[in-house]
Amino acid sequence: MQSWSRVYRSLAKKGHFNRISHGLQGVSSVPLRTYADQPIEADVTVIGSGPGGYVAAIKSAQLGFKTVCIEKNETLGGTCLNVGCIPSKALLNNSHYYHMAHGKDFASRGIEIPEVRLNLEKMMEQKHSAVKALTGGIAHLFKQNKVVHVNGFGKITGKNQVTATKADGSTQVIDTKNILVATGSEVTPFPGITIDEDTIVSSTGALSLKKVPEKLVVIGAGVIGVELGSVWQRLGADVTAVEFLGHVGGIGIDMEISKNFQRILQRQGFKFKLNTKVTGATKKSDGKIDVSVEAASGGKAEVITCDVLLVCIGRRPFTQNLGLEELGIELDPKGRIPVNNRFQTKIPNIYAIGDVVAGPMLAHKAEDEGIICVEGMAGGAVHIDYNCVPSVIYTHPEVAWVGKSEEQLKEEGIEFKIGKFPFAANSRAKTNADTDGMVKILGHKSTDRVLGAHILGPGAGEMVNEAALALEYGASCEDIARVCHAHPTLSEAFREANLAAAFGKPINF
C-alpha cells in the first residue's frame, strides 16, 4: 500500500493542495517539508570550488545541467582566491607602492613625501576586502546561474553518488549522473620541519604575518618563493631564499630570463643561495629559528638564523579521502588522478581537472579544463594545447612566458631563431622610468612560426596573452610584426622582438 508521505508528495507535485486552498475559504496549503538527509538530484556534481571547480559548475549550469558544487571551506574560491593568487597579488601590488614611496623612486619623479609609514594592519584589511568581494562574487554567480552550493567535505560514495559531510557531522547525499573532481592542491610539507603558521609558515601564513620580520628565510626560489619573498623584502625584511636548483623562477623559465631576473632582484636587496639544500630547522628559546643548509652536492654545513621561515617547496594534489580508491580509481606515483583526453577517469562518468591531474598547477589551466570538460559532457569537442598555457611571476618586474624555452628547443633538436628587444629602448618604459628587462621571441628557423615568448619587464603578465593567442592560432613572427601596435605602449616591445626574429633587426634598437 502506498504510504501517506508518497501520496502527499504526489498530490503536492500536481498542485492539488493549491487548488483546494483556492476553492475553500480559510483552508491554506501546507508546504512540502524537505529533509537534509533527502538526496539532491543532479546532472553534474563538482567537488571543489576553486578556479577549476567554480568555473566548471557555472559553465555546466549554463549548458542546462542541474549542477551542484560542494565546497569544504566556508567561502568559495579555493586556495587561489582565499589564500593564494588573489591575496598575494594585493600584497605584491601594495608593497610595490610602499617600496616606491619609501625608497628613492618617488623622489626621482619629483614626488616628495616627508614621512612614509607602513600600516601593515590596513594593508591586510585591503587584501581581505578584495578577497571578500570576490568570494561573494562567486556566490552571486552561483545564485544567478542556479548552481546549488553544498557546504561540506565531498566524498564519492558510489559511481553516481557524492556525500558531503558538514562541520557538525551531518551529511547531504547527492545522487548525480556525472561527478567532477576539482579539489585542487595543498602545500607540500618539508620533511622534519613542522609548519605552525606563526614563525614557520607556508604560503598561507606568509600572507597574514602580524609584523614585518627582521630576517626571513625562504625555502625555495620558485614562483611562490620569489613572490612572497619580494613582498616582505619591499616592506623591510632581510630576505634570503635557499634554492636546491641553480636558478630562480622554477621549472619552465628560460635560463637567460632567469639570470637577468635574479640580477634585478638582487639589486633590489633580495638574497639567494642557489645549489643549496636545507637539512633542518630548529626553534631556539628566544623564538628565532636556526636553518641548517649545505651545498646541494654535499659539503660544509652552515646555519642561517631568522625570525620567520617560509616553506615554499611546491604543492601536491589534494586527492586523499575522496573515495577514489574504493571505486578502483588508482592514483599515479605523484598522487594525481589519471584521466584521458576528455578528463574521464577509468569510470567514464567520473571526471577530474586542475591540480589533481597532470600538467602545471595553474589557476587558468584549471579554468580552461573546467570549461572544456563540461562541454565534453554535453557532447562537445574537447581540446586544450598545454603549450599555449602561459606562466607568470608577479614580482616587479614581472616575468611571463608561454611555449618553449631556448633550452627545451635545443633538447628537442628544433632549429630556431631568436628576436630580442630591451624595455630600455621602449618609449613608454622610458617615460615610466621602468626599463628593466626585455622581450625574447623564439621562432621556427624555416617556417617563422612562433615557438615561445619570454618576457621580463613591466606588464609582462598582460603582454604574454598576446603571445598565447599567437601560439594558439599558429602565427608567425612576421604576422605579429605586421600588426599595428598603439604608440607609445609597452606592447610595442613585443612587436619589435618579433620584427627582430622575422627580419633580423628591430626598428628602434
Swiss-Prot record:
**Where this protein primarily resides, as one coarse class?**
mitochondrion
**Active site per database record:** H487
Q: Which residues carry this modification: N6-acetyllysine?
A: K66, K104, K122, K132, K143, K334, K346, K410, K417, K420, K505
Could you tell me the superkingdom of the organism this chain comes from? Answer: Eukaryota
Residues bearing PTM Phosphoserine? S285, S297
Keywords noted in UniProt:
Acetylation, Cell projection, Cilium, Cytoplasmic vesicle, Disulfide bond, FAD, Flagellum, Flavoprotein, Mitochondrion, NAD, Nucleus, Oxidoreductase, Phosphoprotein, Redox-active center, Transit peptide
Q: In which tissues is it expressed?
A: Expressed in liver (at protein level).
Q: Which cofactors? A: FAD
Identify a single GO molecular function assigned to this protein.
branched-chain alpha-keto acid dehydrogenase activity
Where is the site Important for interaction with PDHX and activity of pyruvate dehydrogenase complex? D448, Y473
State the EC number(s): 1.8.1.4
Pfam families assigned? Pyr_redox_2, Pyr_redox_dim
Gene Ontology cellular-component annotations: acetyltransferase complex; acrosomal matrix; branched-chain alpha-ketoacid dehydrogenase complex; cilium; mitochondrial matrix; mitochondrion; motile cilium; myelin sheath
Residues that bind FAD: 71-80, 89, 154, 183-185, 355, 361-364
Locate the residues binding NAD(+).
G220, A221, G222, V223, I224, G225, V226, E227, E243, V278, G314
Among Gene3D superfamilies, the record links this protein to:
3.30.390.30, FAD/NAD(P)-binding domain (3.50.50.60)
For this protein, what does the record note about how its cofactor is bound? Answer: Binds 1 FAD per subunit.
PTMs? Tyrosine phosphorylated.
Catalytic reaction annotation: N(6)-[(R)-dihydrolipoyl]-L-lysyl-[protein] + NAD(+) = N(6)-[(R)-lipoyl]-L-lysyl-[protein] + NADH + H(+)
Subunit-structure text: Homodimer. Part of the multimeric pyruvate dehydrogenase complex that contains multiple copies of pyruvate dehydrogenase (subunits PDHA (PDHA1 or PDHA2) and PDHB, E1), dihydrolipoamide acetyltransferase (DLAT, E2) and lipoamide dehydrogenase (DLD, E3). These subunits are bound to an inner core composed of about 48 DLAT and 12 PDHX molecules (by non covalent bonds). The 2-oxoglutarate dehydrogenase complex is composed of OGDH (2-oxoglutarate dehydrogenase; E1), DLST (dihydrolipoamide succinyltransferase; E2), DLD (dihydrolipoamide dehydrogenase; E3) and the assembly factor KGD4.
One further remark on this entry is: The active site is a redox-active disulfide bond.
**What NCBIfam families does the record tag this protein with?**
lipoamide_DH
The text of the family note is:
Belongs to the class-I pyridine nucleotide-disulfide oxidoreductase family.
In Swiss-Prot or TrEMBL terms, this protein is called Dihydrolipoyl dehydrogenase, mitochondrial
Species assigned in the record: Mus musculus (Mouse)
